[in-house]
Amino acid sequence: MAAVGRVGSFGSSPPGLASTYASGPLANELASGSGGPAAGDDEDGQNLWSCILSEVSTRSRSKLPTGKNVLLLGEDGAGKTSLIRRIQGIEEYKKGRGLEYLYLNVHDEDRDDQTRCNVWILDGDLYHKGLLKFSLDALSLRDTLVMLVVDMSKPWTALDSLQKWASVVREHVDKLKIPPEEMKEMEQKLIRDFQEYVEPGEDFPASPQRRTTGAQEDRGDSVVLPLGADTLTHNLGLPVLVVCTKCDAISVLEKEHDYRDEHFDFIQSHIRKFCLQYGAALIYTSVKENKNIDLVYKYIVQKLYGFPYKIPAVVVEKDAVFIPAGWDNDKKIGILHENFQTLKVEDNFEDIITKPPVRKFVHEKEIMAEDDQVFLMKLQSLLAKQPPTAAGRPVDASPRVPGGSPRTPNRSVSSNVASVSPIPAGSKKIDPNMKAGATSEGVLANFFNSLLSKKTGSPGGPGVGGSPGGGAAGASPSLPPSAKKSGQKPVLSDVHAELDRITRKPASVSPTTPTSPTEGEAS
């Protein structure tokens, strides 16, 4: 009362009050002295205090309320934090865990007032649903808007996600043990707001106060229509907003999963039926394309602070749908069913909107090249394990050319025989590490050495062709003349012919000499 006493002495009045009473009939009375203490008029004094108290109470009511809350629920990766950060205008951010707290700045230009709206984001894991007690309690229940976020890039999870998180809210509200009378009042308010929805017109009052007053006057004269059979059957007592994020993925669903317009109408019809049951609004958004982001903010401040908005319902664009609470009904949803060609109204959502099969990409195993020395050591160990080939068996790994050997040099057989020193038959084994060409030459050398050793080792036998012990000199004159022509390669048939000629001479070869297995194989 001391402060009020100081107000009574207008010489020491605060600047705000001095300007308030600087004009008007009350100021005129004060200037004339009729309202001063000398007049002694108690009635005028009471009028003065009434005007002051009325002005103060009006200003306090016009301020934006504090303690309003928005609670976001949805699956992991649905874009809850991204949505709020985009509304805030923040590009870079870090996602929280458990229960995340953010806020929105709310500014009223008409009254030049601002406040903050609390935003609570619950983690998509049901393990964290116990944290709801910190964001939604019995005191803040009346001042809370529930936002259910759905990922439209995965439409097959939309309906299950909405039902799951709505049941989480229902379960939590029941645990708060709100008095039945208070809960009934909240439910009736939600029904009344739904029934009294008016389509935005062209003429809107500039001030939210006047809009509220005008709306109350219109409500007294208007006739409230009854609710539909499927409307507000699951009344939470809280305003609900369903936000479908990532609607830019609709084009991807059309290209990759063969979605058509009737599929998107089918999805929208089921989501709108869910919204009717909870009295919720529906907004399709895209953070990537910045679509309907500001619309979400405007709807929040309209529901929590009574701000006006002039945005009508939008149902034509399949990726920018906006349906405010109270606008929709079963007949309007039935318009979507008229576009069905292959689908039916009674089809189950899970049977039509199914999760596509996961395509497993077959990645070829990367082959790492071994070190050259390691590779050669392994190859050597493999060749060493193979059984050795018989010394006299001609093994030729090279492909044969018709009419001759691929490695036969351009010289006569006699020169080959003469150039090789005599080695006992079977005394030389083929090296498994030797290349194919070297192996062929070694087999031929062993073959001719076995012939020479047999001829020189015969007891008392004269040399072939009249020269004792000189097989090479005796064999040279008897070769066919065709083998000595320049440019002509000797063939294997010449060798067989020479061997046949040697075996036909009984005088040159001893009958007791056993035939070499190598010679038999070669013949």
Curated annotation (Swiss-Prot):
Biased composition (Gly residues): 458-473
Region (Disordered): 1-25, 200-219, 387-434, 457-523
Low complexity composition bias: residue spans: 412-421, 474-485, 506-523
Any single biological process term in GO: cell division
UniProt-recorded Gene Ontology molecular function terms: ATP binding; dynein heavy chain binding; GDP binding; microtubule motor activity; protein-macromolecule adaptor activity
The record's account of how the chain is modified after translation: Phosphorylated during mitosis but not in interphase.
SUPFAM superfamilies per UniProt: P-loop containing nucleoside triphosphate hydrolases
Modified residues (Phosphothreonine): T213, T408, T512, T513, T515
GO cellular component assignments: centrosome; cytoplasmic dynein complex; endocytic vesicle membrane; kinetochore; microtubule; recycling endosome membrane; spindle pole
Coiled-coil portions: none
Cell compartment(s), UniProt: Cytoplasm; Chromosome, Centromere, Kinetochore; Cytoplasm, Cytoskeleton, Spindle pole; Recycling endosome membrane
Modified residues (Phosphoserine): S207, S398, S405, S412, S419, S421, S427, S486, S510, S516
Alphabetic keyword roster: ATP-binding, Cell cycle, Cell division, Centromere, Chromosome, Cytoplasm, Cytoskeleton, Dynein, Endosome, Kinetochore, Membrane, Microtubule, Mitosis, Motor protein, Nucleotide-binding, Phosphoprotein, Transport
Residues that, per the record, bind ATP: G74, E75, D76, G77, A78, G79, K80, T81
InterPro entries according to UniProt: Dynein1_light_intermed_chain (IPR008467), Dynein_light_int_chain (IPR022780), P-loop_NTPase (IPR027417)
Function: Acts as one of several non-catalytic accessory components of the cytoplasmic dynein 1 complex that are thought to be involved in linking dynein to cargos and to adapter proteins that regulate dynein function. Cytoplasmic dynein 1 acts as a motor for the intracellular retrograde motility of vesicles and organelles along microtubules. May play a role in binding dynein to membranous organelles or chromosomes. Probably involved in the microtubule-dependent transport of pericentrin. Is required for progress through the spindle assembly checkpoint.
Subunit structure: Homodimer. The cytoplasmic dynein 1 complex consists of two catalytic heavy chains (HCs) and a number of non-catalytic subunits presented by intermediate chains (ICs), light intermediate chains (LICs) and light chains (LCs); the composition seems to vary in respect to the IC, LIC and LC composition. The heavy chain homodimer serves as a scaffold for the probable homodimeric assembly of the respective non-catalytic subunits. The ICs and LICs bind directly to the HC dimer and the LCs assemble on the IC dimer. Self-associates.
Annotated PANTHER family: CYTOPLASMIC DYNEIN 1 LIGHT INTERMEDIATE CHAIN 1, DYNEIN LIGHT INTERMEDIATE CHAIN
Family: Belongs to the dynein light intermediate chain family.
Name the record gives this protein: Cytoplasmic dynein 1 light intermediate chain 1
